[in-house]
């Protein structure tokens, strides 16, 4: 049986001071900022959860100069944080949803008084569910020795794990600039968000279909419109395989996230977009068995008891055993 041990909401706070590389100009003002989750995994330990992953950070800013030229900067921020979680231990199964709940990115001065430090203050919202597989014992029948036992039967329900799986799928496509938009000169940054559109239960597993909504910020050669935004959609599907058919009564918890996103300019009108989507699933079957729920004990029937033999002998036939 699969038992739900922990079901709660929590947060994970990430605070980092990031220093601009030497070749980047000082910051005059932040214009636009973005932070995305990449490759976030969780591991159950004794009394805590270990979160490991990366954040993709991107921002536009005006440089500290007479021209106030717009400059962009992109980097990755590693994350490794332990989260206290009472009642869990290593070996339990996790299914944790993770999303950005609060984001602050500010510029501040370094030791020399120059605006070159980026303060990242991020809060991740966690939807935590921890499960444990246990052996389930059920009473199917009983009898009384000193008394007559009248058995009361009923239906017992329990949940059984079919599969807990993580699969990755690669998707790619060509995006074209819409008429009237400035021509593409250089890619500045790319951003994506995953949406699950359909979860289909079938004989060989659970088929997950969805889309990745992509936005590409690029630099153009036109002075009047120095930047442009290219939008598009990637379609993905992934099968989480199971050893037995997934019935409509089965429960599925599916989490899909964007693990990698890369964009390469092909020419002034097109860009090639590649993405890796991570699909995590916990699929369970809701089972029902007839079990003994109660027993009514009463004095044995004297007449019936008197007619019972004192000993019974059974002679096994050829090929039979005692347990047949």
Regions found by a protein language model. Name each.
Residues 301-324:
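Primarily a LysM-type cell-wall glycan-binding module
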């Amino acid at each position: 049986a699969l038992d739900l041990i922990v079901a709660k909401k929590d947060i994970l706070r990430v605070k980092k001071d990031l220093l601009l590389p030497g070749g980047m100009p000082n910051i005059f003002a932040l214009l636009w900022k973005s932070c995305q989750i990449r490759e976030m995994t969780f591991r159950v330990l004794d009394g805590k959860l270990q979160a490991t992953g990366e954040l993709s950070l991107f921002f536009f800013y005006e440089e500290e100069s007479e021209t106030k030229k717009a400059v962009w900067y992109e980097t990755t921020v590693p994350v490794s944080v332990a989260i206290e979680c009472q009642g869990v231990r290593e070996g339990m199964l996790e299914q944790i949803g993770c999303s950005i709940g609060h984001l602050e990115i500010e510029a501040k001065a370094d030791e020399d008084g120059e605006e070159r430090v980026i303060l990242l203050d991020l809060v991740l919202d966690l939807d935590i569910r921890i499960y444990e597989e246990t052996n389930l014992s059920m009473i199917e029948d009983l009898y009384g020795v000193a008394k007559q036992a009248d058995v009361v039967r009923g239906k017992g329900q329990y949940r059984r794990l079919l599969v807990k799986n993580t699969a990755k799928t690669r998707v790619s496509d060509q995006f074209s600039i819409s008429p009237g938009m400035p021509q593409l000169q250089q890619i500045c940054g790319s951003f994506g968000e995953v949406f699950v559109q359909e979860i289909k239960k079938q004989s060989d597993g659970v088929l997950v279909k969805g889309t990745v909504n992509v936005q590409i910020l690029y630099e153009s050669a036109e002075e009047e419109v120095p930047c442009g935004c290219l939008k598009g959609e990637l379609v993905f599907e992934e099968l989480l395989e199971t050893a037995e058919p997934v019935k409509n009564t089965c429960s599925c918890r599916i989490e899909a996230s964007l693990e990698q996103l890369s964009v390469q300019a092909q020419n002034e009108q097109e860009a090639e977009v590649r993405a890796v989507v991570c699909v995590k699933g916990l699929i369970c079957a809701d089972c029902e068995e007839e079990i003994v729920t109660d027993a009514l004990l009463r004095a044995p029937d004297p007449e019936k008891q008197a007619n019972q033999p004192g000993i019974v002998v059974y002679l096994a036939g050829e090929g039979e055993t005692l347990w047949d």
